[in-house]
From Swiss-Prot:
Primary location: cytoplasm
Catalytic reaction equation(s): [protein]-peptidylproline (omega=180) = [protein]-peptidylproline (omega=0)
GO cellular component, one term: cytoplasm
Name of the protein in question: Trigger factor
Amino acid sequence: MQVTETLKEGLKRAYTITVTAAELDAKVQEKLVEAQPDIEMKGFRKGKVPLAMLRKQFGPRLLGDAMQDAIDGAMRDHLETSGDRPAMQPEVRMVDGETWQEGTDVVVEMKYEALPEIPEIETSKVTLERLVVKADEAAVDEALKNLAESAQNFDDRRKGSKAKDGDQIVIDFKGSVDGELFEGGSAEDYPLVLGSGSFIPGFEEQLVGAKVEDEVTVKVTFPTEYGAKHLAGKEAEFACTVKAVKAPKPAEIDDELAKKYGAEDLAALKAQIAERLEAEYKGASRAVLKRALLDQLDTMVSFELPSKLVEAEAHQIAHQLWHEEHPEEHGHNHGTIEPTDEHKALAERRVRLGLLLAEIGRKAEVTVTDAEMTQAVLAQARQYPGQERAYFEFVQKNPQIQQQLRAPIFEDKVVDLILEGATVTEKEVGKDDLQKAIEALDEM
């Protein structure tokens, strides 16, 4: 077996692997000897079938396996000897594959880009500022007010009052398309908060100003992406009878409100709110700190990037942003989306930082534990109520999804590792300043 280098230019590598006919024949023989003890054939005891007969019957079938094993072994030996780590799966092509005949040498061309040598960084030279926000009394009171509004009751307005935005009306309604009632389009004594956006766009607005006993015909058009395909894009009429108009009445901020939310009393609820707010502030602060760290790391290192990785990342960015700008397009029935220079620059940054963090994690032997993966899968499974088991099975069978869940956990652990060695000072700020810092992340 011979491996000949044909290209070594920057990170690009190309090799010709030659497996001689004799080596391939020996591999086939090896597989036949390995299988012989388990083979039964008429006229022979188990394990006693002559190799010549086995070769005649199974040789052609084993030839492909032997060829693949030989090539895989040559590639594995080469990578171990050279120390190369391919950035992506190597491209492998058999020379004269369509005309190759048994008894001749197998020649394979292998191409790949090697991962670059990544310089070490001195984490002690990383200087960062962590924003710290305390949950003050005003923030807790604001959160309490929001909870009270969420727990609000509705009291009947005086007779003859017109419904306002934010009021709750109780209605009977019957929906029809082209004069025909449709399934699921009718209800009685339905409580609807005007302005809540819980009905089809345009429905609630037409009931503002209605009074008890009013008969209102609401005309709307179902959205084109509506879930019920037979109604999507159709014009509909709803015959509505208003049976009650009620004004919102916020719940009192007291121990009773606290008990509604599972707290022992108001003081305990305030403590829970403060704890939740500070956890939210801490999470937002970490996002700002992480971006600052990545920005700094990006200026500290410079190395050649595998062009194929950058190209793949740029196309993924372009594709993702295109779909964000065209949310109505759910499939892939669109033309090729060519990355812009901005996409390519962002791709280079992501690949550079990704390789740097991966190398730091590799050298520090950072791993993602089974428990951490389980937590990540559980968190995702909660987004599919009633289908959690199916989601678990889907993840188990899909290594790509497993990697998508593992990658951010690994990255965060490496970030924590770098922060441990960095100089990080704390700066106490208000929540508005933190909010501005978070908004600035989206603008970058």
